[in-house]
From Swiss-Prot:
Residues 512-540 form a propeptide. The lineage of its organism: Eukaryota, Metazoa, Chordata, Craniata, Vertebrata. One of its GO terms (molecular function) is alkaline phosphatase activity. This is Intestinal-type alkaline phosphatase 1. Pfam families: Alk_phosphatase. GO terms for biological process: cellular response to BMP stimulus; dephosphorylation. The active site is at residue 112. Zn(2+) 1 binds at residues 62, 112, 377-378. PANTHER family: ALKALINE PHOSPHATASE (PTHR11596), INTESTINAL-TYPE ALKALINE PHOSPHATASE (PTHR11596:SF30). It is found in: Cell membrane. It comes from Rattus norvegicus.
Length: 540
């Protein structure tokens, strides 16, 4: 359904441009001078919030490099009927930005495990290791012990705050696991994934660590199968043995978690989640909505599976009950997986959903007492170019053919499963093909899975101490900013005054000039479509 909408959008925008309906006001220097003046006026009034932060939120767009951010902005605008680039993302309203250097200690191009250790625990680490220093070695169990490093979330819990993890991947995946786990192999999801030698040496699988390493108040995402004994039928897919429990130790980790605390609730579908969120007796909530990863948003059953924005809202509301504040980690994890598949449509629609979760959290919190950071763990070999006309679908074709006389999409990958060269020939691509949900953009090098990119990624910040996010920083700096703002170890003597008592939520500031411009663009697009329809009727 959404793929059909993108194709219609592509057609409409090309018609839009064929009639020359680029906003007339943009031809006048006054338009751009006024926009810059308004932005400058906002910047001149910007003052850092010098208090401590009661609440800490980290949004992690897995694989959301700067090219992905820009393409997401265009897609968000186009899905709203606009040309695209002028439409702001929710994260665009955050006033402080920086660049983060993402390399692992042992890899120039990183993975999500070592990077999670950096931005969550404050220490750079090795490839495929989580919650341990670089002294630990991949897959060597005995190098875990004595090399553990602890997340800011762990320190927040120790300080009396409530804590939560929300993700669209399995909750045992590399990024969320960085908040609670210590492991030398990111793939040790359950005991069934571990060698017997590691178990004998005392290493624990990630699912076990989820319920044993710390008291997490809210856990929302996928990953059911790693919590239940082998052969336990999945409640959603009881006839599919591939979705059944996989644990070899016969432990039911969900039951163990439920028995550990008062006020616990386990849910596995959207209806149960919404019911639990309205129950004041629920003080700890675990929601596992798929056996492994949650569905891509374009494939999500909206009545059965919660969106990332819905999970974020539930988490914020529940955690906000604690007068001492909270720490929340929210991951848009399938942005990364869409890119690995070489399928930009999946990656970018996930990123649009991720931005909607940021907007929801902004509506529910107050920047006076809540530090919110947005970043990525790494980038991807994803790019878009081709001198496309403004308003061309982000999934569309470049206006001119390549030297081989064939069309090509604006979006391309440096490597991945989209490699299509056959005896030196490359196929033509049509608008219909490039707009399909499952279309894999062409790649220069054949790989079964597209790789990460090694360039710096952006950090966006708002709230107390957000001004510390500046310049170009090592990725582990992120954890230190959050720990300092929250006066958490090792900054318990931060010397910061507590935040002012503000109860009203803050919402993203909307630029009135941008809003009016979007309205005009929508009207112009409508006029273009009506002209086309009228022309078609006359011809017929």
């Amino acid at each position: 359904m959404q793929g059909d909408w993108v194709l219609l959008l592509l057609l409409g925008l090309r018609i839009h441009l064929s009639f020359g309906v680029i906003p007339v006001e943009e031809e006048n220097p006054v338009f751009w001078n006024q926009k810059a003046k308004e932005a400058l006026d906002v910047a001149k009034k910007l003052q850092p919030i010098q208090t401590s932060a009661k609440n800490l939120i980290l949004f992690l767009g897995d694989g959301m490099g700067v090219p992905t951010v820009t393409a997401t902005r265009i897609l968000k605008g186009q899905l709203g009927g606009h040309l695209g680039p002028e439409t702001p993302l929710a994260m665009d309203h955050f006033p402080f930005t920086a660049l983060s250097k993402t390399y692992n200690v042992d890899r120039q191009v990183p993975d999500s495990a070592g990077t999670a250790t950096a931005y969550l625990c404050g220490v750079k680490a090795n490839y495929k290791t989580i919650g341990v220093s670089a002294a630990a070695r991949f897959n060597q169990c005995n190098s875990t012990f004595g090399n553990e490093v602890f997340s800011v979330m762990h320190r927040a819990k120790k300080a009396g705050k409530s804590v939560g993890v929300v993700t669209t991947t399995r909750v045992q995946h590399a990024s969320p696991a960085g908040t609670y786990a210590h492991t030398v192999n990111r793939d040790w999801y359950s005991d069934a994934d571990m060698p017997s030698s590691a178990l004998q040496e005392g290493c624990k699988d990630i699912a076990t660590q989820l319920i044993s390493n710390m008291d997490i108040d809210v856990i929302l995402g996928g990953g059911r199968k790693f919590m239940f004994p082998k052969g336990t039928p999945d409640p959603e897919y009881p006839g599919d043995s591939d979705q059944s429990g996989v644990r070899l130790d016969s432990r039911n980790l969900v039951e163990e978690w439920l028995a550990k605390y008062q006020g616990t609730r386990y849910v596995w579908n959207r209806e149960q989640l919404m019911q639990a969120s309205q129950d004041p007796a629920v003080t700890r909530l675990m929601g596992l909505f798929e056996p492994t990863e949650m569905k891509y948003d374009v494939n999500r059953n909206a009545s059965a599976d919660p969106s990332l924005a819905e999970m974020t809202e539930v988490a914020v509301r529940l955690l906000s009950r604690n007068p001492q504040g909270f720490y929340l980690f929210v991951e848009g994890g399938r942005i990364d997986q869409g890119h690995h598949a070489g399928t930009a449509y999946l990656a970018l629609t996930e990123a649009v959903m991720f931005d909607s979760a940021i907007e929801k959290a902004s509506q529910l919190t107050n920047e006076k007492d809540t530090l919110t950071l947005i970043t990525a763990d790494h980038s991807h070999v994803f790019a878009f170019g081709g001198y496309t006309l403004r308003g061309t679908s982000i999934f569309g074709l470049a206006p001119l053919n390549a030297q081989d006389g064939k069309s090509y999409t604006s979006i391309l990958y440096g490597n991945g499963p989209g490699y299509v060269l056959n005896s030196g020939n490359r196929p033509n691509v049509t608008d219909a093909e490039s707009g399909d949900v499952n279309y894999k953009q062409q790649a220069a090098v054949p790989l079964s899975s597209e790789t990460h990119g090694g360039e710096d990624v952006a950090i966006f910040a708002r709230g107390p101490q957000a001004h510390l996010v500046h310049g170009v920083q090592e990725q582990n700096y992120i954890a230190h900013v959050m720990a300092f703002a929250g006066c958490l170890e090792p900054y318990t003597d931060c010397g910061l005054a507590p935040p002012a008592d503000e109860n009203r939520p803050t919402t993203p500031v909307q630029n009135s000039a941008i809003t009016m411009n979007n309205v005009l663009l929508s009207l112009q697009l409508l006029v273009s479509m009506l002209l086309l329809v009228g022309t078609a009727l006359v011809v017929s």
